[in-house]
């Protein structure tokens, strides 16, 4: 009787180990094939705590000796992509930025926040929203992401145009001013803020999303993650390799500070 019981337990344990191994392999295969890639666009801007100065010739904003940081709306986009990865819905987070060598600091910040790798498109020129959208379009066609995230606008020019132009150039569904994101199967539900309240959109993937302030609160980056970010890959490319002409059709005539308001009497 004891031998029969022991033999029965042996077969049960053997069967369980086989089943456990099967499900572990299946889950591992699912994690490799199913999760998606997110491409996050970030921009380096004058820190929001710095008072903006105008050049003496009124040709542009004077950023010399100014603290530069990641655009706050783009920081929210990075945070959301990292959170989606932590929930197992995304397998890779790629960040991309356009600018001079100083933009590398912004990319390292995004990598320290949890992004996996970065793409740096080198240029010294100031670009219009359309050129930026065309550039990100070329990157998107190479990377083939499932979700493209970017801030709804940059705080330096407040154009609020790149996301919309990008979606149009790629012919992809879009949601702007997003305050909530839910992913299920091969579709995405986005809640966006409109003048009358909230609007819920169901989008097929891939899709373009621009983030609002209410989507999340970016995490504080720890020192160990800052150190790890230095070892993550940053690929540098130029406009020639993308086949894009960065010359602008727009010319800035003059930049002035807002006119001072006259004191009122209450």
Q: Where would I find each of the regions flagged by the language model?
A:
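Short, Lys/Arg-enriched N-terminal segments with co-localized hydrophobic residues
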Residues: 3, 20-35
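N-terminal glycine-rich FAD/FM-binding segment characteristic of electron-transfer flavoproteins
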Residues: 31-266
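Tryptophan (W) side chains
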Residues: 10-11, 16, 23
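Intrinsically disordered, low-complexity segments enriched in small/polar residues
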Residues: 6-9, 19, 31, 262
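Cationic, amphipathic, low-complexity alpha-helical segments enriched
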Residues: 1-2, 6, 12
